[in-house]
Amino acid sequence: MVIDAHAHLETPIHGVTPDPGRRRSTHLLMWSYEILGFRNPLWKGEPPGPARALIAMENRLRLSMGCKENLLRYMDRSGIEKSVVLPIAPFSTSWDYLEACAEEPRLIPFASAFPAPGWEKDLEEAVKRGCRGLKIHPILQRVAPEDRFYFDLLEEFAPRRMPVLIHSGEFDYYVVRDGFAAYGDISRYEKLVRAFPEVPFILGHMGLYFPEKALRLAERYENVYLETSFQPLKVVREAIRVAGVERVMFGSDWPESDPRYALRIALKAAGGDEELRRRLTGWNILALLR
């Protein structure tokens, strides 16, 4: 069974409205990046200013594809049986995702919480109703990784021993230089990871432009898992070497990326090793979904 560990549904951020009529993801810069296997011959590390602006624009266009009908269509085309879908409160809520997944067994909803009155009760109810994990996104939520809220949130969530998928990597989302990209710096996540050793933390995108930071954290903490979206084959192979075959998993971050490309890299990383292939493309995330 192939499971995409990282996908999203309707997330109306910065005025972007999901449009079922928008069905293609061939935007020049992002499409080129996918075709090249997420290798970038033009620059190393973070993109320069003009490229950042183009990436932000293309991200908004791709986000507008993010409805359930399109996700299922991309899953069918890519040979994906199930997808973990991740809300980002306050833009999309646990309730939005529970409703979207209610009659679609191929979608596995996570919960999300935001520092607003009543979040504790909402989180408890979301888990009771079927959410299988928690999504944290410091950049888009505009909450610093060191903020007391995340520690209170994990204190509440940790006894369930469910996975927490946290965005990792400094990145401008949809608006260039809005001042919050630094919240994705993985070095700022260590206190949270260390404080809750019983919680499986999945680093979404494995650090984006800074995978070495994700690898260092995974090397130091056994409760850190690595998700492969936007990472080239070389980095995925290194992740398997550093973290081991049980702590790396395929994810695409759909609709920001066509799942075919990240899945192709995961399959190449497995080579002819059938057990590794199954672990990367389903077993590892399935083992965390209690």
Question: Where in the sequence are the language-model features?
Answer:
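Mid-to-C-terminal alpha-helical segments outside catalytic/metal-binding sites
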Residues: 1-5, 13-73, 77, 82, ...
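Conserved, mostly hydrophobic/aromatic
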Residues: 6, 75, 126, 134, ...
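Active-site gating/metal-coordination segments in enzymes
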Residues: 81-82, 86-172
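Active-site neighborhood of phospho(di)ester-bond hydrolases with catalytic His/Asp-centered motifs
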Residues: 2-5, 85-86, 110-111, 135, ...
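Glycine-rich phosphate-binding "P-loop"
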Residues: 52-63, 85, 168-180
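Alpha-helical scaffolding within the catalytic cores
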Residues: 67-71, 93-98, 118-121, 186-189, ...
